Amino acid sequence: MIDKSVTNLDRAEILTQALPYIQKYHDKIIVVKYGGNAMVSEELKQQVMEDIVLLHLIGVKVVLVHGGGPEITDTLNKIGKESQFVDGLRVTDKETADVVQMVLAGKINKSLVNLIQIKGGKAIGISGLDGHMIEAEVKDERLGFVGRITNVDVTPVLDVLEKGYIPVVRSEEHTSEL
């Protein structure tokens, strides 16, 4: 949407002020963590995706890593499963882990990829589970399938970036402990 109160001179000034940052971050990789609470507002989600596409179009290599806490909680509530938290972390048994994967992969990741593409970008959804990209160990037995990251293989992300796409990474990881 174009703000009609902004003149062409204003736009030129904005671009002039942005130029040093465009030059500094051109061809650099930045990781944007897009938390579930920031996804609650549809208007904010639209603006964030527009900003990500803009960064991509000016040559910044954006990696979008998303969560989905509120959406996961809503889905668990719909199936009658109450969320439990220990020290701010969701207790995740097998059933909860399945819901988390369904929400992150089947709903949020696909939605963000689609929105980026509607805004004019090219995106591919990937998971920390893909190719054991993100490995973890159990953080605390009381938390179930909640882990601490022990290794990240960035090769899949770099491959996606090299092909000119924005990787949209859902925050799931692999552990051999459970």
Residue ranges and their predicted role:
Residues 1-176:
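Nucleotide/pyrophosphate-binding catalytic subdomain
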